[in-house]
Amino acid sequence: MTAILERRESESLWGRFCNWITSTENRLYIGWFGVLMIPTLLTATSVFIIAFIAAPPVDIDGIREPVSGSLLYGNNIISGAIIPTSAAIGLHFYPIWEAASVDEWLYNGGPYELIVLHFLLGVACYMGREWELSFRLGMRPWIAVAYSAPVAAAAAVFLIYPIGQGSFSDGMPLGISGTFNFMIVFQAEHNILMHPFHMLGVAGVFGGSLFSAMHGSLVTSSLIRETTENESANAGYRFGQEEETYNIVAAHGYFGRLIFQYASFNNSRSLHFFLAAWPVVGIWFTALGISTMAFNLNGFNFNQSVVDSQGRVINTWADIINRANLGMEVMHERNAHNFPLDLAAVEAPSTNG
């Protein structure tokens, strides 16, 4: 008997690289989306840290009145932020090489655009990487679908809203108090609290946290004990065990008697789909609401909508909100314009002279 041995061709360097990138045996999965995600998120994070610590003041309103945002220029963790790119730049793509000098680039808020654009690309690739890993492992794609909600929200406040308003200076500052300022100004200019899509988002976030707490407490309260009374019930679980770890029948019975029978899920798959879908759909709607308000399709306006038989206004809470909106609007960008847009839009009376 004769055995013929053939020499196996060695795999090319590119082939080995492809196998390493797409291998699910790596401690952290990279994937083709990861090839773009890693450098973009590293860039965004590095520039954010450096700018948060040391960036000079930025002329956000384009009126030669720089606003300080970094720690070395007098801020703390709460008040510090990456100041958005100047209104003088508008929506122009503003990389370092477009400025006459690095000082000019910093003065006009170039780091904000750099961070935001790299960050959005990075989180979009993170979402793609979630789908890619799910695909390689033979899983369904819903993890990436769920993550699309925060990606949509980030895109709405960092990209869609500035596009609608005509300038990156209207984007959300990258800091704690800057975020609050963005929220207050957004309410003043768009009446977001009276927008039904924002209401759906609030229901999604608060409802999601409520349902999460209810589910976690029900499961924890109906564990199948595998240990003695002297040991923690948590110690009875083995990773990968085939047996159920809690009694869904007991949990269903408890909750059905606490509220009513049909308020409780008796199907674990339906339950977990609901837990995922509720907050995700709510945040989708909020992102959609921000994106519509970006183009000034604002919240409901019920100002002075209730009057008596004599035509006199009977104030409602909508009028109280409107008064607060006017107060917030006259306080922000106080040197950029003399009157809020609502008042400035009124046609001036003609004079005979």
From Swiss-Prot:
Annotated GO MF terms: chlorophyll binding; electron transporter, transferring electrons within the cyclic electron transport pathway of photosynthesis activity; iron ion binding; oxidoreductase activity, acting on diphenols and related substances as donors, oxygen as acceptor; oxygen evolving activity
Enzyme class name: oxidoreductase
Post-translational modification: Tyr-161 forms a radical intermediate that is referred to as redox-active TyrZ, YZ or Y-Z.
Positions of transmembrane segments: 29-46, 118-133, 142-156, 197-218, 274-288
Amino-acid positions noted as binding pheophytin a in the UniProt annotation, renumbered to this chain: 126
CDD domains for the chain: Photosystem-II_D1
Keyword entries, A-Z: Acetylation, Calcium, Chlorophyll, Chloroplast, Chromophore, Electron transport, Herbicide resistance, Iron, Magnesium, Manganese, Membrane, Metal-binding, Oxidoreductase, Phosphoprotein, Photosynthesis, Photosystem II, Plastid, Thylakoid, Transmembrane, Transmembrane helix, Transport
Residues that bind chlorophyll a ChlzD1: 118
Residue positions where N-acetylthreonine is found in the record: 2
NCBIfam families per record: psbA
PANTHER family, A to Z: PHOTOSYSTEM II PROTEIN D1
Name this polypeptide is given: Photosystem II protein D1
Taxonomic classification: Eukaryota, Viridiplantae, Streptophyta, Embryophyta, Tracheophyta
